Amino acid sequence: MAGKKEFSVFMHELVPEHRVISEEEKEELLRRYRIRLSQLPQIKASDPAVVELGAKPGDVIEIKRKSPTAGVYLYYRLVVED
């Protein structure tokens, strides 16, 4: 079955929730932490989660991670070309 998606990476219990943030959210993130876009950790456009989200280079991904000590925390990554 070439070309047919058979599995979603987000269905796996170890893969945290991902989403592409809006331009307004991106500007607020940069302002809140007083950083430049280039200072964010990077994630490649070929990453399976990024591909499934349909994100493109320049987008920022918000990752919601669960921690036994911190509860839930947000992590941000900049999508870059391979």
UniProtKB/Swiss-Prot annotation:
GO cellular component: cytoplasm; DNA-directed RNA polymerase complex
EC number: 2.7.7.6
Signal peptide: none
Reactions it catalyzes: RNA(n) + a ribonucleoside 5'-triphosphate = RNA(n+1) + diphosphate
InterPro entries: Arch_Rpo5/euc_Rpb5, RNA_pol_subH/Rpb5_C, RNA_pol_subH/Rpb5_CS, RPB5-like_sf
Keyword Transferase: yes
Localization per Swiss-Prot or TrEMBL: Cytoplasm
Enzyme class: transferase
Gene3D superfamilies reported for this sequence: RPB5-like RNA polymerase subunit (3.90.940.20)
Keyword Transcription annotated: yes
Any one Pfam family match given in the protein's UniProt record, by short name: RNA_pol_Rpb5_C
Keyword terms of this UniProt record: Cytoplasm, DNA-directed RNA polymerase, Nucleotidyltransferase, Transcription, Transferase
Gene Ontology biological process: transcription by RNA polymerase II; transcription elongation by RNA polymerase I; tRNA transcription by RNA polymerase III
GO molecular function: DNA binding; DNA-directed RNA polymerase activity
HAMAP family in the record: RNApol_Rpo5_RPB5
Assembly and oligomerization: Part of the RNA polymerase complex.
Reported function: DNA-dependent RNA polymerase (RNAP) catalyzes the transcription of DNA into RNA using the four ribonucleoside triphosphates as substrates.
Stored NCBIfam families: PRK09570.1
Homology family: Belongs to the archaeal Rpo5/eukaryotic RPB5 RNA polymerase subunit family.
Protein name per UniProt: DNA-directed RNA polymerase subunit Rpo5
Organism: Thermococcus gammatolerans (strain DSM 15229 / JCM 11827 / EJ3)
